[in-house]
Amino acid sequence: MIGESRPLFWGYEVTSCGLIVKPDGTFVTQSVNNKGYSQVALRNLDGQWFGGYLVHRLVAHVFVKNPRPDIFREVDHIDRNPANNVFSNLRWLTKSLNLLNTNAKGCHYIPKWKKWRAQLRRKTLGYFKTYEEAHECYLKQREELFNSEYRQLCENREHEKNIRRPSLIFFSETAARCPIPCFS
């Protein structure tokens, strides 16, 4: 199913599901850039090639109403999957709003494998089909790590309570004199 097709420019058409149709009716080959976004190269009426058109922007330009073209200049993938270019998954946003929908810390999409990777402190926790599964794994591992480190700190605190550390005294005295909060 290719969805509804609408005219783009130079005789090309774009479908609501993210396919680009050539003037002769065949589909344009799409490639994936290093950030996971589909892109195409199109030939103008003079036969010159122009590359790097991002498919999600072409789909949004034709199918998604932009309520404020003066400020909404970026296209957001609602499900955070850059390979999903269906028009119902796209919306126009400002750059700052688009950044709010970026991947949560610890979850990254791997376009080559079409999977989400959960990662904590440079350690891969696993690969998952959906963002939600990867994020859930990340949160669980983060909580376990935090709890174990917290317990360890509490256990060591009783043992180290009476030990004087000159370096800590130096930093606390320096911090007290510093007008700018330079030490936490």
Features from the language model and the residues they span:
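Conserved recognition-core residues within compact binding domains
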Residues: 1-74, 80-171, 175, 180-183
